[in-house]
């Protein structure tokens, strides 16, 4: 169950809008006897909803496939499902009402990961969905048992069109497919789904990014696997390490090309387009494209002709946004901070800024990983070192100088565990002298 385990963790780590079962690899002993490597994981039941959402197990509908009840009943689902199926969702008012019944972003996310990663053991199986029994609650899907995905069998190979094989044969025969197809009749939702699909394959499903998660998962259990196979036999460590795991790497490397082709074919899109994003001057701001914010600029991603792309700019301190312009599509300056264009061919889009800080600007805070996250905006490039002090001026840690370009720079610094209180971070260079106070709380 390697695939299911590492995908669940990766989805959680990546902040996807999914309800997935967390797991931890363990070495199992029963009455002192070694039973090998196992996955300790959450169970897809009402207590998952209690511990993750605080939902009362006696005040929830948790349903399975088309007719099975885990807890609750089908009364609310049948009513909301009937609304979707009997109304024209091309009308935005009707779609927005449907979106108060169903978490449409969660539904899109589920169809993306299941079809994009070739999990064919879904919709007719391994399908659970839930809603708290409150007026404002919406239906969401649980994601579990994805061990058939990513090349486990021939029909989940990287070249298989799982999007079409999930939707076309089951249309009219499966409530969940019918619900999703009905939502897709709305232009904006269809654009959202396709762009979100592209966003994920431009980021977390890139081979070089995805591979790191496989590497980490293999490394966690590899030392115990020879003993595991000594206990259980087939297929044996050598076959697992030299044939089974390489299938995953081969899948990761090849899947994005076919996944995009699947989307293009299913929705009848004309062609793919490669978009390059950057700011001028560099480091003047961030660009949000659809649902993602690239960590570094310039950045490239693949999207689709026929599906408008949304771009939003956020200036860094000291800069003022002026306009967008591109080589082929946005040929005249567009001064709107948030824009939406259909790109018919490869293009380079630049967000232009004026101004810039006269003096260095520094910010700092403790992030969720308990690292010191800093932002430093420089009027000029410099070799900058950072120093951490307590409020009495005692040096706690020094970080050696490194080159930082003009504009905004963000860094995460590993610091020791420190007690609650106020601290000072300084940045020093040939043309940089700036400090800032920040708070460490419990």
Predicted segments — roles?
Residues 1-72:
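Conserved ATP-binding subdomain of kinase catalytic cores across diverse folds
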Residues 25-29, 34-38, 49, 66-278:
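Middle-to-C-terminal accessory/interaction subdomains
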Residues 228-229, 308-335:
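Surface-exposed interfaces of beta-sheet-rich extracellular modules
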Residues 290-319, 343:
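Extracellular modular ligand-binding repeats in secreted and cell-surface proteins
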Residues 336-356:
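Conserved "repeat-terminator" motif of extracellular CCP/Sushi domains
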Residues 356-388, 410-417:
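Glycine-centered coil/turn sites that cap beta-strands in beta-rich domains
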Residues 374, 398, 411-412, 416, ...:
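C-terminal tail/sorting-segment detector
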Residues 388-396, 423:
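Short, glycine-anchored, charge-dense loop/turn motifs used at functional sites
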